[in-house]
């Protein structure tokens, strides 16, 4: 297991390096000069040149990357051009906000979707299967931002059950914090539950067709025993992998939900930084998300043998 973990970590290093180079190059292809943007249209060429020199933008791309990546290896993501704050501190602070939403949504979706998918497979082509698959397909087809707006309109503006927009830290007031996070969590939950139900159903159907399941039924075992002892564990492996991918994808794509509900999370920070041409923050956000994505997949790979004995044997 240790060798497997070390091999995965070694494989992640070139991935992160490629991400770092790609992020560095792509954001510099975005039109606009950060120095000009900060100083405004009335700035003189001399003041713009001076600010570019202080920000290191007058150097070649290779020199800029070497300096930036050298600092990254020391845990220093630089300073924000617009706010002057430490990028590492800013990114981590906003990440904690986003992580609350993503983890809660994925956990709730998994707890509901996996049993629902198993039931749909067990009752294939009967009304429970048709209802669950139809609901899952509908939820997947609705764009996240539109789903968020519908919830905001219905639960917030019409029924007044939940706060419409804003954020309160759970550390300051856990009751108010949960109320403000409820709609963002519900939005992601409803969208991702459809994906997980379909995956769990497909995995369970594949396992139900295998010979050892037929043999277990022929031995007279109850359907409950067959499903729990022979189907669930073997069908959960692919779903477990998908849960990890969903977790990583949500963290990288949560900007839409955070924008709709004005949540000060990592996605909102990235969007604001892009509009402000804040290179250090953009680079820090994207590199951090990539690192978390790689870490999540590493954890998924390490725990996968628990659900597939064949992988553990290998």
Q: Whereabouts are the PLM-identified features?
A:
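Alpha-helical transmembrane segments of integral membrane proteins
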Residues: 2-3, 95-128, 144, 157, ...
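Hydrophobic alpha-helical transmembrane segments of membrane transport/permease proteins
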Residues: 15-66, 159-180
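Membrane-water interface segments at the C-terminal ends of transmembrane alpha-helices
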Residues: 22-29, 59, 70-71, 134-165, ...
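An internal, D/E-rich "acidic patch" concept
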Residues: 58-114
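Short amphipathic alpha-helical coupling elements at transmembrane boundaries
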Residues: 3, 40, 50-53, 67, ...
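Hydrophobic alpha-helical transmembrane segments of multi-pass integral membrane proteins
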Residues: 17-22, 61, 103-107, 150-151, ...
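N-terminal signal-anchor/signal peptide hydrophobic helix marking the start
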Residues: 6-12
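Short, membrane-interfacial amphipathic segments enriched in basic
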Residues: 1-2, 58, 62-63, 74-88, ...
